[in-house]
From Swiss-Prot:
Transmembrane segments: none annotated. SMART domains: AdoHcyase, AdoHcyase_NAD. GO terms for cellular component: cytosol. The lineage of its organism: Eukaryota, Viridiplantae, Streptophyta, Embryophyta, Tracheophyta. Homotetramer. It is an enzyme of class 3 (hydrolase). This is Adenosylhomocysteinase. It comes from Mesembryanthemum crystallinum (Common ice plant). Its EC number is 3.13.2.1. InterPro entries: Adenosylhomocyst_ase-like_sf (IPR042172), Adenosylhomocysteinase-like (IPR000043), Ado_hCys_hydrolase_NAD-bd (IPR015878), NAD(P)-bd_dom_sf (IPR036291), S-Ado-L-homoCys_hydrolase_CS (IPR020082). SUPFAM superfamilies: Formate/glycerate dehydrogenase catalytic domain-like (SSF52283), NAD(P)-binding Rossmann-fold domains (SSF51735). Its cofactor is NAD(+). The gene is SAHH.
């Protein structure tokens, strides 16, 4: 494809939309730093010892202002960094420009095609003749997936000379992945094996990527150690819940200017993300209906005052539909045909397969009207009524808005820094096998503690007698591993 890597005056590679936005990006990064006490504390604690000196880190995670603070924390600790976004719509171009100019190699811009997206992912993994990265910060697992699929293809090629055939799958995106690997084989038939050999491990940010890791662990195909950052309490119970409580109405209002009060909102799924979305719609005055498969989550929703029904029960009644499941085929084209005129359909899960966009786009006679970027109206011919789809069924909170605020992302990204440090510091110890791990409770509590002062909190201290009475150390951790919060 006709894309070329550019270089800064210092020789750093990049590909972003507009480098003239770098100064604007820097101003917003400086604002975000004040709201990200955990990351700034990591710089203070670890910066002088440069623990990442010599480490090459590849990131595949939304290239936002908040991520810029994460990247500059990694570089402040001594790492070299190459970065791409994990979603075609989520990059904030001024953030990408500032980091590309000042700190790290960035390959990301808002509105990438899928082909451009995978080109950027490949560039972020490309560390030249020395192989790939030492560490990966992943979000959704696409960088991890590319390496695993590359290794598998190279093994097949070595055994029987088979080259990946993009036409062997009906999935348009996976066709691009196979095409990349096919082209790579022609240049270096051991490229992904070299990456696998060098890799110390990956830390994974989100629920969807974690599911992929556990699937690979179960089948014995996981190629390197992984730390599940998503299931740190200070990630899933804060970013997923309170972050989505903030970002869902933000995205809805920026995209449509709709008044949420008085509307009927349907939240598909009531995990941590769904809980945040349902709370947000309720707080804005909507009547909220939840769809669920899990009786425990369903009962939780009922206890919060939400109604539990199936999508089929409410498809013609509701005004706003939000998918939060991390599963596929949640809202299908037959559902969308039955919706009210101008019902809003959006997804806040990681991938784009919760909403049947392929079925919608290929529906006979359907007319697509682009209102503005990432806001489209699809009109059905038989009724001449339409629905409004946000971010083409992808992650609406970053496609239509700017995602989660800096403070809650500081909790998540402090976990990422700690996970990366843990993998790197233990790289020669044998502590981590080719399995999926979570960070220990005392580190989870440390992340929380780093964020209390910013909010004016003052913790009560246990006496020695009190600590002994409940069988915990005076300084924690205070809860057993199985405690659910």
């Amino acid at each position: 494809m006709a894309l070329a890597v550019e270089k800064t005056s210092s020789g750093r590679e990049y590909k972003v939309k507009d480098m003239s936005q770098a100064d604007f990006g820097r101003l917003e990064i400086e604002l975000a730093e004040v709201e990200m006490p955990g990351l700034m504390a990591c710089r203070t604690e670890f910066g002088p010892s440069q623990p990442f000196k010599g480490a090459k880190i590849t990131g595949s995670l939304h290239m936002t202002i908040q991520t810029a603070v994460l990247i500059e924390t990694l570089t402040a600790l001594g790492a070299e960094v190459r970065w791409c976004s994990c979603n075609i719509f989520s990059t904030q171009d001024h953030a990408a420009a500032a980091i590309a100019r000042d700190s790290a190699a960035v390959f990301a811009w808002k509105g990438e095609t899928l082909q451009e997206y995978w080109w950027c992912t490949e560039r972020a993994l490309d560390w030249g003749a020395g192989g790939g990265p030492d560490l990966i910060v992943d979000d959704g697992g696409d960088a991890t997936l590319l390496i695993h699929e590359g290794v598998k293809a190279e093994e097949e090629y070595e055994k029987n000379g088979t080259i990946p055939d993009p036409t062997s799958t009906d999935n348009p995106e996976f066709q691009l992945v196979l095409g990349l690997i096919r082209d790579s084989l022609k240049v270096d038939p051991k490229r992904y094996h070299k990456m696998k050999t060098r890799l110390v491990g990956v830390s994974e940010e989100t629920t969807t990527g974690v599911k992929r890791l556990y699937q690979m662990q179960a089948t014995g195909t996981l190629l390197f150690p992984a730390i599940n950052v998503n299931d740190s309490v200070t990630k899933s119970k804060f970013d997923n819940l309170y972050g989505c409580r903030h970002s869902l109405p933000d995205g809805l209002m920026r995209a449509t200017d709709v008044m949420i009060a008085g509307k009927v909102g349907v939240v598909c799924g009531y995990g941590d993300v769904g809980k945040g979305c349902a709370l947000a719609l309720k707080a804005a005055g909507a009547r909220v209906i939840v769809t669920e498969i899990d009786p425990i989550c369903a009962l939780q929703a009922l206890m919060e005052g939400f109604q539990i029904l199936t999508l089929e029960d409410v498809v013609s009644e509701a005004d706003i539909f939000v998918t939060t499941t991390g599963n596929k085929d949640i809202i299908m084209v037959d559902h969308m045909r039955k919706m009210k005129n101008n019902a809003i359909v959006c997804n806040i899960g990681h991938f784009d397969n919760e909403i049947d966009m392929l079925g919608l786009e290929n529906y006979p006679g359907v007319k697509r009207i682009t209102i503005k970027p990432q806001t489209d109206r699809f009109v059905f011919p038989e009724t001449n009524t339409g629905i409004i789809v946000l971010a083409e069924g992808r992650l609406m909170k970053l496609g239509c808005a700017t995602g989660h605020p800096s403070f809650v992302m500081s909790c998540s990204f402090t976990n990422q820094v700690i996970a990366q440090l843990e993998l790197w510091n233990e790289r020669a110890s044998g502590k981590y096998e080719k399995k999926v791990y979570v960070l220990p409770k005392h580190l989870d509590e440390k992340v929380a503690a780093l964020h209390l002062g910013k909010l004016g909190a003052k913790l009560t201290k246990l006496s020695k007698d009190q600590a002994d009475y409940i069988s915990v150390p005076v300084e924690g951790p205070y809860k057993p591993a199985h405690y659910r919060y």
